[in-house]
Amino acid sequence: MSKAYEESGVNIQAGYEAVERITSHVERTLRKEVLGGLGGFGATFDLSQLKMKAPVLVSGTDGVGTKLKLAIDYGKHDTIGIDAVAMCVNDILTTGAEPLYFLDYIATNKVVPSTIEQIVKGISDGCEQTNTALIGGETAEMGEMYHEGEYDIAGFAVGAVEKEDYIDGSNVEEGQAIIGLASSGIHSNGYSLVRKMIKESGVQLHDQFNGQTFLETFLAPTKLYVKPILELKKHIDIKAMSHITGGGFYENIPRALPKGLSAKIDTQSFPTLEVFNWLQKQGNISTNEMYNIFNMGIGYTIIVDKKDVQTTLTTLRAMDTTAYEIGEIIKDDDTPIHLLEVE
């Protein structure tokens, strides 16, 4: 190892140890289409093995935001990687694409092999749960860019869908139903506000809240919707989908709608998670604003024909996914979303 490089703040040996630690986690995610192994200059994936007639590649990249601060402050590094995967694969899933592979980027003040292993374990868990290969990544040690103990992670996912099956919302029509899939909690958005509420409330994160600790509640990994949605695609014609992330209902559901149509949502048709009630009370936040920030208990929405509602609910529930009929599509040139019972 270069002594000069070490004196500048880069520990190459720690990097080597981190790679050794993560190898077994990465290997459990690999699919048969992956060519080669770790250590190459570029990762390779054989699309021909998918047996698609006209594959369309769909890509997405994202991070975890300031949820990371909670994970770092409380030394809980083994699930934040699931969030990084979920934020990417849930996004590309909205086109009907099956996620194929994932790459990660970790930047840190100092490479601590045990911490890197925990982060990559979480990433690998998310990849394994969605049959997505973790085929590459980068860990950068940048002591001058981050404070001690800090790190940031970002992910990049690629999926594929048959061109004729690509979902873009163009087949959405008046009268179709909106199905909401339950979230696992806050997911990965709104954490600057969450952390502000934690600080102002003075709550101790190891205290109990609704059957678990506050910390477990706030760090609950983002739900992965890949398997239930890919299964549902085999049974019905999905018209459009939305991943409820930053901007809540107001920002994300209209993204799936053609001009002239609007989503009418009955907010009494699904339960609001207790964590959102707590946040709203602590921050004295209006219900309208809450729906403009958080998922409020619905992390993903799909639009289907009315005749397919029961099949949709039955299929999703058989995949251990809680789902509700939460609204319908109406004509409206001016307002892209109507939330009933919201002030």
Curated annotation (Swiss-Prot):
This is Phosphoribosylformylglycinamidine cyclo-ligase. InterPro entries: PurM-like_C_dom, PurM-like_C_sf, PurM-like_N, PurM-like_N_sf, PurM_cligase. It catalyses: 2-formamido-N(1)-(5-O-phospho-beta-D-ribosyl)acetamidine + ATP = 5-amino-1-(5-phospho-beta-D-ribosyl)imidazole + ADP + phosphate + H(+). SUPFAM superfamilies: PurM C-terminal domain-like, PurM N-terminal domain-like. Its EC number is 6.3.3.1. GO terms for cellular component: cytosol. Pathway: Purine metabolism; IMP biosynthesis via de novo pathway; 5-amino-1-(5-phospho-D-ribosyl)imidazole from N(2)-formyl-N(1)-(5-phospho-D-ribosyl)glycinamide: step 2/2. GO terms for molecular function: ATP binding; phosphoribosylamine-glycine ligase activity; phosphoribosylformylglycinamidine cyclo-ligase activity. It comes from Staphylococcus epidermidis (strain ATCC 35984 / DSM 28319 / BCRC 17069 / CCUG 31568 / BM 3577 / RP62A). Pfam families: AIRS (PF00586), AIRS_C (PF02769). It comes from the Bacteria. GO terms for biological process: 'de novo' IMP biosynthetic process; adenine biosynthetic process. The lineage of its organism: Bacteria, Bacillati, Bacillota, Bacilli, Bacillales. HAMAP family: AIRS. Belongs to the AIR synthase family.
